[in-house]
Amino acid sequence: MAAAAATVTAVQPAASSCGKRDGDNACVVDMPRKAKKGRSPPEEEVEAFLAAAESSVARRFAAKYNYDIVKDAPMDGRYEWVRVRP
């Protein structure tokens, strides 16, 4: 039995100090640091990307809830929007 335990131990990788329950910072020591390569994208490209993402979210929200979040107004559809005053 001792021989079987020895082979199992040899097959298993060395125990690591970072487990799934440990925080992310515990594993950082073992990982090599990557150098930043390249530069940030141009501001126009970032703005175009974010504008497209924002309009996509607005379209999906309007289709789902028949409410235009850009104009902040209800649309015709399956829901009836009623103003509630607190």
Curated annotation (Swiss-Prot):
InterPro entries: CDI_dom, CDI_dom_sf, KRP. The keyword Nucleus does not apply. GO terms for biological process: regulation of cell cycle. Residues 1-15 have a biased composition (Low complexity). GO terms for cellular component: nucleus. Keywords: Protein kinase inhibitor. Signal peptide: none annotated. The keyword Lipoprotein does not apply. It comes from the Eukaryota. It holds the Pfam family CDI. GO terms for molecular function: cyclin-dependent protein serine/threonine kinase inhibitor activity. Residues 1-23 are annotated as: Disordered. Belongs to the CDI family. ICK/KRP subfamily. This is Cyclin-dependent kinase inhibitor 6.
